[in-house]
Amino acid sequence: MRNIDFNKYQSALIIGNGFDLSLGLSTSYMDFVNSDEFQILLNMQNQLTIYLKVNAELQNWIDIENELKLYSKNEDNAKFKTEYEALCKQLVVYINNIDYSSINKNSKAYEVLTNLSSTKNNIILDFNYTASTRLILKQCGLSDEDIDNRLIKVHGEASNNDIIFGVEDNAGIKKEHVFLRKAYNIKYKALNFSELYDRIKSVAIFGHSLGETDHTYFNKLFQESCMYNKWKIQCKLPPKTKRFCPLVLK
């Protein structure tokens, strides 16, 4: 992870998968589970993907990261690591096959990012694996250098084959399944946004669920907002889902 001078930024945009969905891209985990890339694993009798497919069909929705925790706790699969690694590889293939020509330029996500591109005091924390943010910023006339100075791909990019996919470090998984933890990934470098949070005056969140899997990134952000009323943060959450912000925004 390159060094970034946070001193010049006054605001931050946090982007999650809802951003790509707003653009009209098929980036939900259900899209992946129903894809040809996932079907290849099913045809190979990959037990992990069979488990995920069954649960997705039962619920008509799936949070793969949460299901990985449950699978670790409840299943005994000697091939778990191998099958998990195969899942990660196919996820990269799936994302790299996304057709960006279908991006909805009339979407709210596109509007937000294009408006943001015209100012230089904003930094973007992108939790997606896709190339959508980089592509739109290029369409807005930003150079590769400008984009690299303003865009942090927190979990890596599929185009570079360096995605960080797994569970949070404090997840209750079996000790032999440590490979599931994001910090276990050799490409993972813990990002300390404390300096950024100390300097920025506003935070916008688009399409990020603020879930437990990214708890460490947002802990200081929300705790200080509550204690010092530093920022006004609004978030709309789906019912019956566990999210981080209700734990601190009371």
Predicted segments — roles?
Residues 1-13, 17-202, 208-250:
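Conserved catalytic-core helix/loop/strand module for nucleotide-ribose chemistry
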